[in-house]
């Protein structure tokens, strides 16, 4: 089972809460733009503590939304957060056993080896007329040197797991029997202090980064009047 590079500690859960709040708007817009159709059975891959699962319930209404994650601790929190959904411990790098009208992932491929193969496996679980929906970062733009240092460090951490941090290009290839309905770059501005808050919580899972953590914490407290701009690739395929 693929190990998540950033762990499932209390700080990791705090970071995921910040990520959920920070990127809620672009994700909600993407889900609203998914072409209409039968959307009764929905899978949320790498659901963590259930933030994206709640968005899927909001977007597709009553039905059967199932969150899948490798961490039982994360899923315990997800069950409390989204009692209307179902949750299953499973490895998203293996074939999915639940067919669905919608298969969704956000910022997950960057943690997986061979992301293109993962897309093919996920598409195999999509029912005809259903949608495979993915969001992956392409890059972020900032003039802050500390953010450049963070990016270099996290790129190495993810690469050590056999994965690629900026997984947006993995969405270039079309899974078999799928055609693109959406393919766009969403730009999303985030306050520099909020970006620093997410980043230092990540950095605590690595050894040997105390100076980087301290500088990011100082930046969170200072909360300067500037932004970091994420470029997020949003793609939706419809299964033939």
Regions found by a protein language model. Give the residues of each.
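C-terminal helical/coil "lid" or tail adjacent to the Rossmann-like core of SAM-dependent
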Residues: 3-5, 11-12, 23, 177-228
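Conserved alpha-helix/loop element of class I SAM-dependent methyltransferases that forms part
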Residues: 21-41, 55
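Class I SAM-dependent methyltransferase SAM/SAH-binding core
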Residues: 41-43, 49-95
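A short acidic, Gly/Pro-enriched loop at the edge of an enzyme's catalytic core
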Residues: 94-103
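Residues lining the SAM
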Residues: 105-110, 135
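A short glycine-rich, Lys/Arg-flanked "PGG" loop and its adjoining helix->strand segment in the class I
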Residues: 116-128
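Conserved catalytic/acceptor-binding region of the Class I
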Residues: 131-193, 205-209
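Core SAM-dependent methyltransferase catalytic element
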Residues: 232-240
């Amino acid at each position: 089972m693929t190990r998540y590079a950033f762990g499932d500690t209390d700080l990791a859960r705090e970071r995921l809460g910040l990520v959920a709040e920070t990127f809620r708007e672009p994700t909600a817009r993407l889900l609203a733009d998914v072409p209409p159709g039968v959307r009764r059975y929905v899978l949320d891959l790498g659901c963590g503590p259930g933030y994206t699962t709640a968005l899927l319930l909001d977007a597709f209404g009553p039905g059967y939304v199932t969150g899948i994650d490798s961490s039982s601790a994360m899923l315990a929190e997800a069950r409390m957060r989204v009692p209307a959904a179902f949750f299953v411990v499973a490895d998203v790098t293996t074939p999915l056993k639940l067919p669905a009208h919608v298969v969704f992932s956000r910022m997950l491929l960057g943690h997986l080896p061979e992301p293109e193969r993962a897309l093919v496996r996920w598409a195999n679980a999509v029912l005809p007329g259903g949608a495979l929906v993915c969001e992956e970062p392409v890059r972020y733009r900032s003039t802050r040197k500390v953010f450049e240092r963070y990016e270099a460090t996290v790129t190495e951490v993810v690469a050590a797991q056999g994965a690629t941090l900026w997984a947006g290009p993995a969405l270039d290839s079309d899974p078999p029997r799928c055609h693109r309905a959406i393919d766009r770059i969403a730009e999303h501005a985030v306050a520099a202090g909020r970006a620093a808050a997410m980043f230092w919580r990540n950095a605590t899972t690595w050894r040997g980064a105390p100076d980087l953590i301290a500088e990011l914490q100082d930046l969170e407290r200072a909360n300067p009047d500037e932004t970091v701009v994420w470029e997020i690739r949003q793609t939706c395929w419809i299964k033939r």
